[in-house]
């Protein structure tokens, strides 16, 4: 959890925002997935947002659903994902690692056991995509018991009451949604969300990172100009994996070429 705080302090001193890529663990296979994550970090990723393959991903558009299918095809299990997380943490001791998941995966293990395992392998945050704030008590309580930041999604139409709850219960960062709907780079992020950012700050929420539809450096810059602490990009990155599925080296080069200008756009 503290890794996020340290990161945001460091970035503020350097007048930078955070660039956070999302990928599905085990896509397209364990070995290449670990290389992908190393490449993202080497190219400038400030934190990681990682998915555990799940059979019914509600918030995911087709690009990320396909990533899940590729990981399943490679036989990747949640247990192997935790082994991968331990390896990533060992190799990259300071980078914040967040999981983006669904409640069933948490329930499968037992809520407390799931967060205990997150703590053990060095996961900093967990966003449970299909659990709304008002139903989050058992998740966030278990998270805090195990020093894992509970992350909440702030939708573009959030009312004052929801903003207060997100500010009160969330830790690490706040996932600021560019727009409603499913993830996907083909739906570009909409208007700057200045009013939400202002309110979240007023209520002392964890720093907002804008996600959904972030696929170009100008959008990263716009998110930061609107007051966000950074931007999360998922589908655009997963698409690169898909496009180079049979060319592992080209894939890594293309990922590097995508991340570098996205990170550069966070520097004022």
From Swiss-Prot:
Catalytic activity: (1S,2R)-1-C-(indol-3-yl)glycerol 3-phosphate + L-serine = D-glyceraldehyde 3-phosphate + L-tryptophan + H2O
EC number(s) stated in the UniProt entry for this protein: 4.2.1.20
InterPro entries documented for this protein: Aldolase_TIM (IPR013785), RibuloseP-bd_barrel (IPR011060), Trp_synthase_alpha_AS (IPR018204), Trp_synthase_suA (IPR002028)
Example GO molecular function: tryptophan synthase activity
Pfam family, one: Trp_syntA
Active-site annotation: 49 (proton acceptor), 60 (proton acceptor)
Pathway info: Amino-acid biosynthesis; L-tryptophan biosynthesis; L-tryptophan from chorismate: step 5/5
Purpose of the protein: The alpha subunit is responsible for the aldol cleavage of indoleglycerol phosphate to indole and glyceraldehyde 3-phosphate.
Subunit structure: Tetramer of two alpha and two beta chains.
Family: Belongs to the TrpA family.
Name assigned to this protein: Tryptophan synthase alpha chain
Species of provenance: Escherichia coli O7:K1 (strain IAI39 / ExPEC)
The encoding gene: trpA
